[in-house]
């Protein structure tokens, strides 16, 4: 199971240029609901390894990416495929 830590610097390479669809988990270390969601994200990463890339983005450390997705509450999940937004879910 591989979960990639993505930030403002590597977002384009890890997400937009990914050949696989990417599930992005926008989170923050202080966010309790994010901590509760973490085991589910880990499970998805394990079950779909090789079919889906899972990326975690700390909104406090990557404000440019968070702002570009208009993240106003977390956790927020986003799916990107071939550089395009496919879907998103809050909470």
PLM regions and their residue ranges:
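Conserved Rossmann-like nucleotide-binding pocket used by diverse enzymes
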Residues: 2, 7, 27, 53-55
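A short beta-strand-turn-helix
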Residues: 3-22, 63
């Amino acid at each position: 199971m591989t979960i990639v830590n993505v930030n403002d610097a590597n977002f384009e390479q890890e997400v937009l240029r990914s050949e696989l669809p990417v599930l992005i988990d926008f989170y923050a270390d202080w966010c309790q609901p994010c901590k509760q969601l973490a085991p589910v994200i880990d499970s998805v990463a394990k079950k779909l390894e090789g079919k889906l890339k899972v990326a975690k983005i700390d909104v406090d450390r990557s404000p440019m990416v968070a702002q570009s997705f208009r993240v106003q509450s977390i956790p927020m999940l986003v799916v990107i495929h071939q550089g395009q937004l496919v879907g998103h879910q809050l909470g």
